[in-house]
Structure formats: C-alpha cells, structure tokens
C-alpha cells in the first residue's frame, strides 16, 4: 500500500477535523468522491490524545462504510476501541483491525519502558497489518505499509529510558516495586543490570548500597558491576547506570581487602580499552572522572597514558563532555604524566582549533591556571618546578605568537584576558601588550571581543606601558583629513570603543581620588594621571550634548560629576564649569541626536593614520 494512502491523525489537535478532509496529519489526499472509484486507505488512531473525541464520528462512520478502508487501533484497548463496543460500531466488525503493542494506554504517562514503542514492535505491527490487509484485499498485495515513529509527548521521559524493565517478580499487583524488596534478592536473582538501568531500580540500588553490607554482598556487587567488561560499559553509558557505577567504584576503591589492587587493575583495563569512546560519552565521562579521582595514583597515571595523541585528542578537548576529563586530569594528576597534553595543545595548528572552541578554550585556560598555581606550591621538588616552568613557557610562547588572532575570537579572547589579568603572568602580559596591542589599540577597541582585552590591558598594565597606551590614544593617530576626528572621538561614540574610553576615565578618576596606586617603585605618577584626566574632561565637556543622548555618554558625564562632588581638589573645579552638572545635558537638541547617528555610521569604519612608524 502506498505511503500516500496512509492517514495519520494529528497529535495534540485542538480543533475537530473530519476524516474525509483533504488534510490528515502530514499527508494530503483528495476529498472522497462517491463517483470516483474508492481506493484502499488506512487510519491510524494509535496516537490520539483526549481531543480525539472532538472528531465528527458520524462522518467517520460514513467513511468507514467503504469496506476497503481500515481503521487501525491498539490492543490493549485505546479509547477508540472502547467506542467500538457502541451500537453504532457493531455494523463494521471487519473495518477495525486491532494492532497489538506493549502499551497499556495512549493517554496514561508511564515511568516504565512499556511506554515506548520500540522498533521491534513496529516490525511486528507492520507484518500483522500487512497480513490482515492482504486477507481482505487481494488487490493490495503489492502495496507496502510504512509506519513513522510517533512523536514523544511533552511529558514523556521514554527517551531517557533503557530498553530493559524491572523483572515481574520485583513488582506488586499494582505494577510498583515491592516495598519489602531487599538487595540480597536482587543480587541473587542476577537481575542487577535491569535494576541499574531503570530510574526507580537505580534509586533503590543507590540507597541500598549506602547501608550496611556484608562482605559477600560487596563481593557480589563488585563482580556484577565491574567484574565483566560488557556489563561495566553498558552501565557506564546509561543515564541511570553511570551513577550506580560511580557508587560501586568508590566503594570498591575504599574496600581495602586482598582484591583491591586487582579490582583497580581490571577497572583501569576496562576504561583504557575504550578510552576515547567513554570520554566522548555524556555519561561514561563521569565514570572516568570518578575513577581518576579515587583510583590509586599509579594506576590513574597509567589510565592517563591511554589518552590518544592524534586528532582524537582535539575531539576530546573540544567536546562538551570529554573536556571535563582533561580538566580532571590536569587537576589531580602530576604534570609529568600529562605533559604530552601541553605539548599537543601548544602545537600551532592544534592551538587554533582548541582555543577557538567554546569548550576547548576552557581546557587551555585550566592548564594555564594549574601551571601558574603550582609556582607557589612548596610541595613540588625543584625538578617538578623546572618541568612546570618549561611547560608554561612552551604554551605561553605559542599563545603570544597568535595573541592578536586569539584576542579577536569569540572564545579565545578569554584566554588572553586571563593572562593579562594575572599578576603571576606579568612577563607574558607585558609581551602581549607590546607585541599584540600597542600600535593597534584603535582598531582592536572597535572589535567586539578584542575591546575586552584592551580594557583588561589598561587596568593591569604597568605604569610604563600604561603611559604608552594613553599617549597612543590621545596623540598616536593623525586626525582624519576630511572630518577632523581623532582616535578619541571615534572611540567615544563607537559601540565597543566607548567601553575602553570609560575604562580610561575610571582609571584616571580612581588614581586622582586615591583609590588607585600611582607609585611604581620610587616614582609617583600622579601628575600623569591628572594630565590624562584633564584631556578626557575637556573632550567630554566639548561633546556633552552628543554624549547625553547615549547611556555610555551619560556614564562618562556622571563619572566626572561624581569626582567633582567628592574630590573637588583635583584641579578642574575652580572654573565652575557647568559640564559636571548632569541636569544641564537635558537641553540637547534633537538635531544633535540625529547628527550623532549619522556620524556614528561613518566613524565606525574609520582607521586613522598612525603618527609613528610601527
């Protein structure tokens, strides 16, 4: 039977639709005509929701009088088959073809696996339906019946379920787990796997193993969970079973008997044989992390050596789940056992792929944080410190060589921000500022992501480099020959550059008000901050009408007004200039606002000529 002749009722339909309409579900067929030769059709009412009662059943009966039509229902009964017992349905006994499937009701939600229609059930249904159709319609022997998998309801949790169900002996007459079920019964029955992959069963097991257990019960648990590789891998990759596996691993590693090391060896071998696949699995990656955390250190180090050294390691670093395995390795394993990861990441072609990824950038940042934190670890030997310094230098050299490309990336910019903000990485911070940012401040300030890096550089740069950066913004670029706009003008009204100007203004205000240290060594740079503040004040005063139209401009005005009110001794208050009163900016004309919008588009693309040679 052609698929085009199948009719499917629409799930969650709230408006009545007649069976003879031209649209049923997603299939379009011409409306029924008494004059035309009727074709064999099939209706599938198995996925109906309570709104099915709104169907016009009289029209349905008129359509069903054609003996070549078939209405497919379920057994056990659905509400439609309940209606079949009515008097109006009794004249159509051959029309309705019950299709068996393992489900109690189309409407009743269930936490058991019986609420899911599996591929095997579909194949059985198709064979049964094909037999019945051929029996009643010999002309349709060459037709093919195809089923599409019904969509899961909003509240359905069957997509998280295993194919297994709890054994019948563990259930009461209501289909619920017996209240007096014991762990010993489960272990002796050999059905532990079925419990571990079921939500209710797994909760029962987790609660049971936290109680007092005999030595024999522990032995049974270890054998049935981590004793066989196939069972271990199946549970590790299961949404519920992985939690139970983690419980048993923790119990196994803290049970100090004669078989403790043997169990750990077996566990290490199981994971090593499927290391990449388990790392990439949403649930098994948690089992690996738990093993690394609790396993004997020597065996955990051997487990790390099972990580690949090829493109698969990139896949692990950038995977949503597997990246946490790398971070766990970095956190709990000595550097000498994962130094190969640093070398792999520091390779230029690998660094770009990993840093440009949402999860990979976090892996690189975690490595940098670990290598930096260990610099003050007094427990490390001199050899370990030397190894740490070499690894950090290799990674930082690779990062600084690509710092401008990384600074403009959506994710990699966080790595550069972290380096610039960390005082323990001051050497590499200065290298990034000199090599990447200087002579590019105007262009980078207009980049969405690089502007954050420029802000961090202004906040954390040493005085010598800060002075060079300030001078570059104020005097480092020639004004545009056509508009006369300089770098500060462009940045003040740019959607990203204005944040850099706000940062510059905040730095100067904090220094003048005493909230920022102005001494570096034996020299006090307070005068430099006052000079920079006067330049910013002058420009904000000049552009106050335009700035008052935007929230960023209002913040600059408010910052200077607050400084004047709290610290009137910084050198600008004597003029009594009204620009520091925020209420005076409300008189700006509408023309100024329109002119700002017009100029903003042009200024956004400007790149002024540098007054210095690179």
Swiss-Prot record:
Pfam families: PUF. Residues 283-614 are annotated as: Binding to gld-3 isoform A. Pumilio repeats lie at residues 185-223, 224-263, 269-305, 306-342, 343-382, 398-434, 436-471, 483-519. The keyword Repeat applies. One of its GO terms (biological process) is post-transcriptional regulation of gene expression. Expressed specifically in the germline (at protein level). Gene3D superfamilies: Leucine-rich Repeat Variant. GO terms for molecular function: mRNA 3'-UTR binding. The keyword RNA-binding applies. Residues 160-564 form the PUM-HD domain. InterPro entries: ARM-like, ARM-type_fold, PUM-HD, Pumilio_RNA-bd_rpt. Keywords: Cytoplasm, Developmental protein, Differentiation, Repeat, RNA-binding, Sexual differentiation. One of its GO terms (cellular component) is germ cell nucleus. Its main location: cytoplasm. Residues 1-34 are annotated as: Disordered. It comes from the Eukaryota. Fbf-1 and fbf-2 are >90% identical on both nucleotide and protein sequence level. Experimental approaches often do not distinguish between the two genes, which are collectively referred to as fbf and are considered to be functionally redundant. Interacts (via C-terminus) with gld-3 isoform A in an RNA-independent manner. RNA-binding protein that binds to the consensus sequence 5'-UGUGCCAUA-3' in mRNA 3'-UTRs. Involved in the control of stem cells and sex determination in the C.elegans hermaphrodite germline. May also play a role in the hermaphrodite germline proliferation and oogenesis. Binds specifically to the regulatory region of fem-3 3'-UTR and mediates the sperm/oocyte switch. Negatively regulates gld-3 expression, possibly by directly binding to two sites within the 3'-UTR of gld-3 isoform b. This is Fem-3 mRNA-binding factor 1. It comes from Caenorhabditis elegans. The lineage of its organism: Eukaryota, Metazoa, Ecdysozoa, Nematoda, Chromadorea.
